[in-house]
Amino acid sequence: MFSVLILIPVIGLLIYFLYYRKLKPHKVNNIREMYAEGLDMLVSGKRIAAYKNFKSIINEDSNNIKAYLRLGQILREGGNAIKALKIHKSLILRKKITNYEKIELHKNMALNYYELDNFDK
């Protein structure tokens, strides 16, 4: 009888945690899904929706360099290379940036300068 009284709350807690995990996905997975959706929107030509999506990713995770790169890309392709350049310049001082992200950053900055007809930089 005593073991049944202990077993019922344990099972209840187990069900609660399993149910809670299904409803609340991990933040990292959610951001990855949002990033994938943003790329899909970008490819589909839905630039405004992609912009909002990458902006919300940055609001949740300000260390997401890839989202900043895509945000700048959308701005540059939309005719706002100055704002794109500001975003990309702000990433230069980041310490936790991979080599791939550095290459992408410099490529995007070069495209920004090209768009601005500023080849001296």
Regions found by a protein language model. Give the residues of each.
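Helix-centric, low-specificity signal for extended rod-like, repetitive segments
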Residues: L14-I15, L69, I87
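Long, contiguous interaction/recruitment modules in multidomain scaffold/adaptor proteins
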Residues: M1-N29
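Alpha-helical segment of the N-proximal tetratricopeptide repeat
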Residues: N29-N63, E77-N80, K86, S90-L93, ...
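Short coil/turn linker motifs that delimit alpha-helical repeat modules in TPR/alpha-solenoid proteins
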Residues: H26, E60, I97-N99
